[in-house]
Amino acid sequence: QIAARYGVAPLTITDTHPTAGTAITVASGFWRRLYTCTIDKFVPELREGGWSWQDSIRYTQPGCEVIGGTSGSPIISVDTKEVIGINNTGNESGGRCTVNNPCEVDEMGRITAQKGASYGQELYQIYTCLDANNEINLDRTGCLLNKPR
């Protein structure tokens, strides 16, 4: 339907956890700009203001110095052309755990912040929650998505 209506092929969401070193492109429709780099590492916990994410993707620098307005942009594997995540934040001024200044929390609970670091969230977990009708069921056994509080 997407191809027929808009003349473009839809992107596929990956069903596997990405790996560090994967070449990626963050494609911003808002700014009509592509940012290309690799996955630097996975952050056990990323905190920003009142939000917290697990297993976040951190991008290498230079290359993916994403800016305001790129949140929600797909993170695409250069090799497979699959969407592996969604771009969502970056540390703008070097602050720690505040809005627009996310911080990283490692496995030992140590908190660090890196000015200019940018991050995204993985999508493979969606597949763990799909039922037989391809609908998301958060109560499905093995579902890895967070449930609303």
Regions found by a protein language model. Name each.
Residues 2-10, 33-128:
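Active-site region of chymotrypsin-like
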Residues 10-39:
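Short glycine/Trp-rich loop-beta-loop segment that forms part of the substrate-binding cleft
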